[in-house]
UniProtKB/Swiss-Prot annotation:
InterPro entries: aa-tRNA-synth_I_cd-bd (IPR045462), aa-tRNA-synth_I_codon-bd_sub2 (IPR020751), aa-tRNA-synth_I_CS (IPR001412), aa_tRNA-synth_I_cd-bd_sf (IPR008925), Glu-tRNA-ligase_bac/mito (IPR004527), Glu/Gln-tRNA-synth (IPR000924), Glu/Gln-tRNA-synth_Ib_cat-dom (IPR020058), GluQ/Sye (IPR049940). Belongs to the class-I aminoacyl-tRNA synthetase family. Glutamate--tRNA ligase type 1 subfamily. It comes from Clostridium botulinum (strain Eklund 17B / Type B). Its EC number is 6.1.1.17. The keyword Ligase applies. Its main location: cytoplasm. A motif ('HIGH' region) lies at residues 12-22. Keywords: Aminoacyl-tRNA synthetase, ATP-binding, Cytoplasm, Ligase, Metal-binding, Nucleotide-binding, Protein biosynthesis, Zinc. This is Glutamate--tRNA ligase. It holds the Pfam family Anticodon_2. The gene is gltX. Binds 1 zinc ion per subunit. GO terms for biological process: glutamyl-tRNA aminoacylation.
Length: 485
């Protein structure tokens, strides 16, 4: 018998930016499907109307397109099991909820907000978690019909047992058993007629033929309630893949509410989308080798969801920055230059050889947004301290720097504009170094410092001189001498 085609879904709520955790869920769902030549479906979960944010659906589409996580079915591309927007499926959920009522697996609840608030206050006073007391389960058929005829607002609740236990399997966390006494009678249909996230998920996953459900491990505790719904309907339970949380540090989860970076933030900071996707793949999954750099195609080939870890993953900014640098170095010079020019133009207004700057920075750059700070001195020499001239390794001191700059200045002034190139400047300066019998760094470090006013520069003394030109280089050397006196 042929195995069932794998179908996974990414089902985000359009409530704002694409968080790193959401993108990882999308990536893992995509990889599970595509590893087995299956289908990846996009479903928009907009049942919580109060939290919807204008433009958030476009962010979802744009992020998936940008990262190459192309969906086979969804609101924008269609498919055979649509509609793919939950608010457009309202009638479907109500029909299934009423079916559960008929089976005794759900019931109408007419409790007022005041009564529910009182129950919550009582639970708080007793320091117990709030749990609905099944008050409306005991209404007679006549009482229910009378309430409906009056038009009283209602919700439909799941009818969970209070004794025994429910067991389910998760491919990451194994067999999990929960006492039924801990299960609340969760709301399936809200008073506005829309389903809750939990109920819509189960109905849609079944109707859309989803075989593997990928989500965060915060949903582990809800899984027994989902399973009871599947069993009540007589449906197959999908394979659960609950992913470990992504942590900011050992104590705090990564959270947009705490100002942690979204995917859009990372792109705006100068991270390459390929690097971000690669890094996110490794937040909870290990290929079993020391390899760390993977294209989306390579991830699709190697990914096995059984290798996802139970342990929380720490979002390490330094590691992401390193990985981004690896991806930048894989770019051709022309590709890097195209990405870098907008960053250069943020700080450079004068005419510079931008391609030469890219040639210097390409192998050193880890983050595109760092580029402006690395070259801003070209436009205008910053104020700097003479402490910069002190460099132990270069054997450079304030005194030696003044002495050597005063000796090199006339050499630089004598170079004709027609000979203003790296090789010629190098030749003349090294002739001086040799005649003075000093270490190379004792001359080159002060020249570089005087030309840049910075401890880090895209190139050495000669590259900076070429970029700045003869006139500006002489002007800056003179300023350095004045500062050191």
């Amino acid at each position: 018998m042929a195995s069932k085609k794998i179908r996974t879904r990414f089902a985000p709520s359009p409530t704002g930016y694409m968080h790193v955790g959401n993108l990882r869920t999308a990536l893992y769902a995509y990889l599970i499907a595509k590893h087995e030549a299956g289908d990846f479906i996009l479903r928009i979960e907009d049942t919580d109307q109060e939290r919807l944010v204008d433009g958030a659906v476009d962010i979802i589409y744009n992020t998936l397109k940008l990262t190459g996580l192309n969906h086979d079915e969804g609101p924008d591309v269609g498919g055979e099991v649509g509609p793919y927007v939950q608010s457009e499926r309202k009638a479907i959920y109500l029909e299934y909820a009423k079916n559960l009522v008929e089976k005794g697996e759900a019931y109408y609840c007419f409790c007022s907000k005041d009564r529910l608030d009182m129950l919550k206050e009582n639970a708080e006073a007793l320091k117990r978690p709030f749990k609905y007391d099944k008050h409306c389960l005991h209404l007679t058929k006549e009482e229910i019909e009378a309430n409906l005829a009056k038009g009283l607002p209602y919700v439909i609740r799941q009818n969970n047992p209070t004794t025994g236990s429910t067991t389910f399997d998760d491919v990451i966390y194994g067999k999990i058993t929960v006492d039924n006494s801990e299960l609340e009678d969760m709301i399936l249909i809200k008073s506005d007629g829309l389903p809750t996230y939990n109920f819509a998920n189960v109905v849609d996953d079944h109707l859309m033929g989803i075989t593997h459900v990928v989500r965060g491990n915060e949903y582990l505790s809800s899984s027994p309630k989902y399973n009871r719904l599947y069993e009540a309907f007589g449906w197959d339970v999908p394979i659960y893949v609950h992913c470990p949380p992504i942590m900011k540090d050992t104590h705090h989860k990564l959270s947009k509410r705490n100002g942690d970076a979204s995917f859009e933030d990372l792109i705006q900071k100068g991270y390459l989308k390929e690097a971000v996707l690669n890094y996110i793949a490794l937040l909870g999954w290990n290929p079993g080798t020391n390899e760390e750099i993977f294209s989306l195609e390579e991830l699709t080939e190697k990914f096995d969801f059984k290798d996802i870890s139970k342990s929380p993953a720490i979002f390490d900014d330094a590691k992401l920055k390193w990985m981004n640098g690896e991806y930048i170095r894989k770019l051709s010079l022309d590709e890097f230059h195209e990405l870098a020019v907008p960053e250069y133009k943020k700080v450079l207004k004068k005419d510079f050889d931008l391609k030469f700057i890219s040639d210097l920075l390409h192998t050193r750059c880890e983050l595109l947004s760092d580029l402006a700070d690395q070259i801003d001195f070209l436009e205008e020499l910053p104020e700097y301290s003479t402490d910069l001239y002190v460099h132990k390794k270069m054997k450079s001191t304030v005194e030696s720097s003044l002495e050597n700059l005063e000796k090199v200045l006339p050499i630089i002034e004598e170079i004709d504009e027609t000979n203003w190139n790296k090789d010629y400047i190098h030749e003349k300066v090294f002739e001086l170094i040799k005649s003075l019998e000093i270490k190379n760094g004792q001359m080159l470090w002060p020249i570089r410092t005087a030309l840049s006013g910075k401890s880090f520069t895209p190139g050495g003394a000669f590259e900076l001189a070429i970029l700045l030109g003869k006139e500006e280089s002489i002007s800056r050397l003179k300023k350095g001498i004045e500062l050191l006196k």
